[in-house]
């Protein structure tokens, strides 16, 4: 059985023999999360993580129904940004038959987004104060490309998972 700390090195060292097709990905635009309340979610993303509100919008009617393939969909949207990434928060106002999904990190279909941070312990404490709880204790990577990096998952009330990484090998964003 392979140690999980080898995964980052293995993926980073992988080479491909063929170039990507011309229609391939050339840039990441955003990561989207569906939440119960944009206002509650903004407390985490802005007050804890330090993102900035970029804009708000709403969608209803034919466009969003075709996009989601769900009749009667009405969405509220907030876009928030931090250096290098944008998060899209979506609050579904309709239809009413929605559910909260909270898969474990090992469950198929589980998704998370990861961020390097300046102070993992402070962020975990601030997150916990508003209901975003660490899934386990902070772990230290003991070898490979991420050696010395502390990391932890936190999950919010909506089931959104975020991985926090603090590394002595990655330049701090606080300058």
Model-derived features: where do they sit?
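Short hydrophobic/aromatic-rich motifs at helix boundaries and adjacent loops
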Residues: 12-15, 49-50, 94-97
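Core segments of cupin and vicinal oxygen chelate
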Residues: 34-84, 122, 129, 145-147
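Aromatic side chains
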Residues: 33, 44-45, 51, 92, ...
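The feature marks the first
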Residues: 18, 28-29, 51-54
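A cross-kingdom feature marking solvent-exposed beta-strand/loop segments within repeated
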Residues: 58-74, 94-103, 135-150, 170-175
